Amino acid sequence: MFVWTHINKYTSRYINRYILKFTRYESLRLCMLNFTSTIKNENKIYSKKNFNNVLMQNIKITEDEEIICEQFFFSKYNLPYVLKIPFSDLRLIDTCNNNHNPTILIRKDMILLRTGFLSCVIRYNELWLFEPREPLVIKATNLIKQNLKIIYGFKGDMSSGVEIPLNELKDEKCQENVNMYEKNIRNDLYSTYEKNISDDINDAKQKNMCSDINNIWSNHIKIDKKRIISGNYSRLNRNNIWENDREINKKDIFNIKEKKNMNENDDICNKIKIVGKEELNNNIKEDINYLNVENNFYRYKGNISFEFLCLDICMQLSIKEYENYLDTINITLRQKIQLQQKKEENIEINMLTNNLLREMMKIKNKLQKLSNLLNALRSNIEKILKNETDMKNMYLTTLNKISINKIKDYSDLEILLETHLQLTDELSGELENMEEKITHYEELMRLNLDYNRNKFILLNAKISFSTLFCSICAVITSLFGMNLKNFIEHNDYAFFIVSIFITSWSIVGIYFTKNINTLLRFFDKYNVK
């Protein structure tokens, strides 16, 4: 602070005073003013408070079953006191600390989760998420709020579009739902009757349709004639179905359009399916079921635990992020392999470039890092599945009301954890396949490198032998070019003999250079060095 105050005084007294005089040089003046303004605002940009503050996302359920979603700024020094967790546990799940692998810590009244992409603190009625501005955290927040609105906002509402299994409800409630369903169907039938009934009806057509209906009723269970429920009539065309109240008359005919082909005895007693409001459309269901794993247990069951819902969504989003990250690496790897194959098909120089080796090393390092994260997450899930005490301590909502000794069945939590364990196993299998692919590709590159190295060694040997034979011929011809007595100057056949010798020697040199492998085998056989 002492240095910055002196710099500010110096700039305000001297620099700004002389800069303002350069009115003619507008660009220079603006550049200097921008420089001095950045110096003045340096303390605001690099203040210590910005490095120590942490933004947190809080999702809380009140006693009135109201959902509160807020964001808070906390200091790192006050964060353990606000979250009521020790510094050692906070250090393991802090997103700013990249030295720790994914962890799942089970404490007495909370679950601490770090998946590599998400970090959160889960209690029986609230959730704290780190880095709420991250896209994955925003998506997790929206999914949790949507599920909570379905659970608390539309629980028991028949128009909410939620499927309720009847085996989890009491008989009275089941009967009420059946009666309500029949009442709605009956009202729809009477409304269609008022709109579509016509006075002029062909007698022959009416009798044929009535005979078909009598054949169908003989195969189904008898019901009250006053009650009209849509059935699954496979023998009729599904355009028009005619029904009679007491006797088949021309005036008491109902026109029933195609609504839903539902078997009365099977579908009504097994499942009540109600067309919901616009709030639960297909897009919301796809977002909630983000992976192929359907979390129907948490959406449809009566006793829903808030902590399991948050844990399920955070784990699903994190595993999906691992899958996307693995797909991007797989795409880049395929591109590199296809590029190398195209080069080989085009008969280019089959050499390994430095850039290709560096990229393969980067891909291998990324896979190794991803493998470490997935193995750490798998090991944490396996430890929890083996420890019964941790499994019981994860029932935070139940432990808020009863003691831990009364918890005997935790099969629902086992299903949740084993589901995510299976997903991590599948990702680990894909990662191992990619590592094997990279290892195979590296072996091919090594073979390619050895092949090219042998070609260069062979070329070097050919050049050496050709140089040797050519140098011998050059030495012989150079002897005749000197002004020395060789005692064959006066011989008429001297030039002819020397020319034949040099030509034959050149032919021998060309032959051995071309068939250098036989020469190398000869040297190896007699240990010629």
Curated annotation (Swiss-Prot):
It is found in: Mitochondrion inner membrane. Its main location: mitochondrion. It holds the Pfam family MRS2-like. Keywords: Coiled coil, Ion transport, Magnesium, Membrane, Mitochondrion, Mitochondrion inner membrane, Transit peptide, Transmembrane, Transmembrane helix, Transport. GO terms for cellular component: mitochondrial inner membrane. The chain crosses the membrane at residues 456-476, 493-513. Residues 514-529 are mitochondrial matrix. GO terms for molecular function: magnesium ion transmembrane transporter activity. Residues 336-388, 416-450 form a coiled coil. Possible candidate for an effective malaria vaccine as determined by epitope response in sera. It is a multi-pass membrane protein. CDD domains: Mrs2_Mfm1p-like (cd12823). GO terms for biological process: magnesium ion transport. Residues 477-492 are mitochondrial intermembrane. Belongs to the CorA metal ion transporter (MIT) (TC 1.A.35) family. PANTHER family: MAGNESIUM TRANSPORTER MRS2 HOMOLOG, MITOCHONDRIAL, RNA SPLICING PROTEIN MRS2, MITOCHONDRIAL. Mitochondrial inner membrane magnesium transporter required for mitochondrial magnesium homeostasis. Involved in the development of the sporozoite in the mosquito vector midgut. This is Mitochondrial inner membrane magnesium transporter MIT1. It comes from Plasmodium falciparum (isolate 3D7).
